[in-house]
């Protein structure tokens, strides 16, 4: 869902991405450069395929995902040495590949999204089904180094949903109804406060629209577009809050 709420790409971003795909020989398989890329490599991927490399240097997944999303499912199943290669691009948005014949610098400005199970069997902390020891669980999470964790801004823990819950009711709908009931109880003052916290304007013409209970992709994208426009006005095209310097953080 992440790519569906991200704003369209600027002309400069499209041109940069087209160059990357052209070098990789994949331009024909991606005719629409206005849509941000979403790359989800298999956990068996090598360092060269992820970062880029080869005798004749070719862009890796980090460059093919530039200006879009790189999704690593089951992060703990990836080779630890491969994951560690993400430090540089996550920090700088670029990747430098060194060869005997010289060095090559490629764009690698992507959003990293990952998913992991709570343990090797996937049932922790349900001790009626999980057979992993505390040592096993710690070892499972220990495959992700502290430097990589430091580069991840948001971490969300999800509880297992039973099969009966999945087929018996729409969990999202129930949550939305609950928010609306709470909104009715808080009254007008509560609604004004919720509007301020959630984001007031979502339409291009500046019309006021409450977004609580309406978090579909199209509505969320309008909010993101509005926020990105503010960032572009402050920092310039192609730079967002994640690339702010210390001085810029203090200023804004």
Positions of predicted regions on the chain:
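Walker A/P-loop
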Residues: 1-26
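Active-site phosphate-binding and catalytic loops of NTP-dependent enzymes
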Residues: 10-12, 24-29, 58-59, 93-100
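Basic, amphipathic alpha-helical bundle interface domains used for macromolecular binding and assembly
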Residues: 57, 80-252
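Conserved alpha-helical scaffold flanking the Walker A/P-loop in AAA+ ATPase domains
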Residues: 31-32, 37, 48-70
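Conserved RecA-like P-loop NTPase ATPase core
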Residues: 2, 14-17, 50, 65, ...
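Conserved Walker B
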Residues: 68, 74-78
């Amino acid at each position: 869902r992440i790519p569906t709420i991200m704003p369209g790409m600027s002309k400069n971003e499209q041109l940069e991405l087209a160059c990357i795909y052209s070098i990789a020989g994949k331009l024909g398989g991606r005719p629409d450069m206005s849509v941000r890329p979403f790359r989800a490599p298999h956990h068996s991927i090598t360092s060269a395929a992820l970062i880029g490399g080869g005798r004749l240097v070719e862009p890796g997944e980090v460059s093919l995902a530039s200006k879009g999303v790189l999704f690593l499912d089951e992060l703990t199943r990836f080779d630890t040495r491969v994951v560690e290669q993400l430090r540089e691009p996550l920090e700088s948005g670029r990747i430098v590949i060194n060869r005997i014949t010289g060095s090559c610098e490629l764009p690698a400005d992507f959003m990293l999204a990952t998913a992991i199970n709570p343990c090797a069997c996937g049932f922790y902390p349900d001790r009626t089904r999980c057979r992993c020891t505390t040592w096993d669980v710690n070892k499972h999470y220990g495959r992700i180094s502290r430097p990589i964790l430091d580069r991840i801004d948001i971490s969300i823990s999800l509880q297992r949903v039973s099969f009966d819950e999945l087929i018996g009711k729409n969990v999202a709908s129930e949550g939305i109804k609950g928010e609306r009931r709470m909104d009715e109880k808080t009254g007008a003052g509560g609604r004004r406060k919720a509007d301020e916290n959630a984001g007031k304007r979502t339409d291009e013409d500046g019309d006021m629209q409450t977004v609580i209970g309406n978090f579909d992709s199209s509505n969320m994208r309008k909010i993101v577009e509005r926020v990105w426009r503010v960032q572009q006005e402050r920092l310039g095209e192609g730079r967002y809050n994640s690339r702010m310097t210390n001085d810029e953080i203090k200023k804004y």
